[in-house]
From Swiss-Prot:
It catalyses: S-ubiquitinyl-[E2 ubiquitin-conjugating enzyme]-L-cysteine + [acceptor protein]-L-lysine = [E2 ubiquitin-conjugating enzyme]-L-cysteine + N(6)-ubiquitinyl-[acceptor protein]-L-lysine. It holds the Pfam family Ank. One of its GO terms (molecular function) is zinc ion binding. This is E3 ubiquitin-protein ligase XBAT32. ANK repeats lie at residues 50-79, 83-112, 117-147, 177-206, 220-249.
């Protein structure tokens, strides 16, 4: 009876949370604002069972304004659902680059992996063919320097503050079974994604492994060319071959890429995958991906330091941004020195196709909307100052309780500890109620055995974190262990997430 009373109480407190979930899913910004003004703690609500928060729903649907509202209301930006996915992962899965950009600006962790396949946000973006999301995810690793394209091509280890080994480790991080972002992009035939990954240092020689947790229908020891051969995209195969992919590579099944193509009835690939015949000369243009976007690191750093959403009043002696005509100019483009607001510079850096065909333009630069000269980086203007953000805890309403175990006020100290247990009941006047005066009904609602984080959207265990330490990844000792006995845990990226390949192919 004690447990049933707890469950009933938590369900009774969920009506407002479900309204916020509906508003986040449907993109109702006014409803979401009204609910959060009434109770800011609703941002930490998570649905029963799947544990999706309003942040997950708004990110999956691409409602970037609601995402900003929820993050500013104090929700954990790296909150996971039952599959271990964060809001950043779901935004990358559906290709909502605006949401990805906002989450990156607020400091979302790009290295977290899910519980089923060990894939990161980078894997999901590559799987579904979203190169713009990939470029935003890697904005902290690609410098805004004129010679960046040559550094990436020559694969120099450390030049001008750029450490290619760190970028190489991030972009070639493997999920369960050794699956890299290049594997899943090549499998699904996303040529633009494959080109961007190769330009940023993705390895064509990295192979999958047999780790006992995945079922690989192609075979362990497969390269990205094996996966491209299974997918059947001619351009992907040609691009991988031009970057040095080996036609004679053999996986654990003894299959070459040509044999994989035959087993999946991709007969049109045999001519270019046959290692014994003379390969035709491939005349692929030696130009960077149109999504390279060199200015991205510089403007993201400025936005994180000085803000990007402030609509400051313009002084009479200062001209507005020439693009939006609403905000004051805060940054200037290196070279042409044209001034923009931070918001417009962010939009320009993420949506413009980079220049690559003009000989006098730096590869990877974006064209200036005023003079069409290439922009490699942005610098903040002298009057642009760092912003001081208001602490989200100070905005939390203490007068409105949410998902508490009694009808009284939740102690503010409990909000900072996800493993708290209920303290003695606090009266509405703020004084503690004597033990003798407490009713048995309130005593029966003690939640020491019922984690309040299930209502508040927090985690009741320490979640695994992948951190970049000294150029390598280390996982905390309290990491999540995937059970090899679970059916879902054994589904590989190939069998669980591939949308273009059926499982009815015959073996060689």
């Amino acid at each position: 009876m004690r447990f049933l009373s707890l469950v009933g109480n938590s369900f009774g407190c969920s009506a407002s949370g479900e309204r916020l979930v509906s508003a986040a899913r449907d993109g109702d910004l006014q409803e979401a604002k009204a609910l959060l003004d009434y109770n800011p703690r609703l941002a930490r609500y998570s649905t029963f069972g799947v544990r999706n928060s309003p942040l997950h729903y708004s990110a999956a649907q691409g409602h970037h304004e609601i995402v900003s509202l929820l993050v500013e209301s104090g929700v954990d930006i790296n909150l996971r659902n039952y599959r271990g996915q964060t809001a950043l992962m779901q935004a990358c899965q559906h290709g909502h680059w605006e949401v990805v950009l906002i989450l990156i600006l607020f400091g979302a962790n790009i290295h977290r992996s899910d519980y089923l396949n060990g894939g990161t946000a980078l894997h999901l973006a590559a799987l579904n063919g979203h190169p713009r999301c990939i470029r935003i995810l890697l904005s902290e690793y690609i410098p805004s320097v004129p010679n960046c394209w040559s550094l990436l091509k020559n694969k120099k280890t450390s030049v001008a503050g750029f450490d290619s080994s760190v970028l190489h480790e991030v972009i070639n991080r493997a999920a369960d079974g050794g699956i890299t972002p290049l594997h899943v992009a090549a499998l699904n035939g996303h040529i633009e994604t494959v080109q961007l990954l190769l330009d940023l240092g993705a390895s064509v020689t990295q192979v999958t492994v047999e780790d006992g947790t995945t079922i690989d229908l192609i075979g362990a020891g497969s390269t990205a060319l094996h996966y491209a051969s299974c997918g059947g995209n001619t351009q992907c195969c040609q691009l991988l071959i031009s970057k040095g992919a080996c036609l004679a590579a053999v996986n654990s099944n003894g299959w070459t890429p040509m044999m994989v193509a035959r087993s999946w009835h991709r007969n049109w690939l045999e001519e270019i995958l046959n290692p014994t015949t003379e390969q035709p000369q491939l005349h692929l243009p030696n130009v960077p991906s149109p999504f390279l976007c060199l200015p991205l690191m510089s403007i993201v750093n400025i936005a994180q330091e000085c803000g990007w959403r402030e609509n400051d009043c313009l002084t009479p002696c200062r001209d507005p941004c020439a693009v939006c005509l609403e905000r004051k100019c805060t940054v200037a483009a290196d070279g042409c020195a044209h001034e923009f607001c931070t918001n417009c510079a962010l939009y320009l850096s993420t949506t413009s196709i980079t220049s690559s065909k003009t000989s006098n333009v730096t590869p990877g630069s974006v064209p200036c909307p005023l003079c069409r000269n290439g922009i490699v980086s942005f610098t903040k203007l002298p009057h642009t100052t760092a912003t001081t953000r208001t602490s989200t805890s100070s905005r939390t309403s203490i007068s409105l309780s949410f998902c508490t175990c009694s009808s009284d006020v939740l102690d503010t100290a409990l909000l900072t500890n996800p493993h708290y247990s209920c303290k003695p009941v606090v009266s509405r006047t703020g004084s503690r109620t004597p033990q003798s005066a407490r009713s048995s009904a309130f005593r029966s609602l003690s939640c020491r055995r019922f984690p309040p984080s299930l209502c508040l959207g927090g985690s009741d265990v320490d979640e695994p974190r992948s951190r970049l330490i000294g150029g390598s990844y280390s996982r905390s000792g309290v990491g999540f262990r995937r059970s090899t006995s679970q059916v879902e845990g054994k589904r590989s990226w190939f069998s669980a997430l591939n949308h273009c390949v059926t499982t009815g192919g015959s073996a060689c």
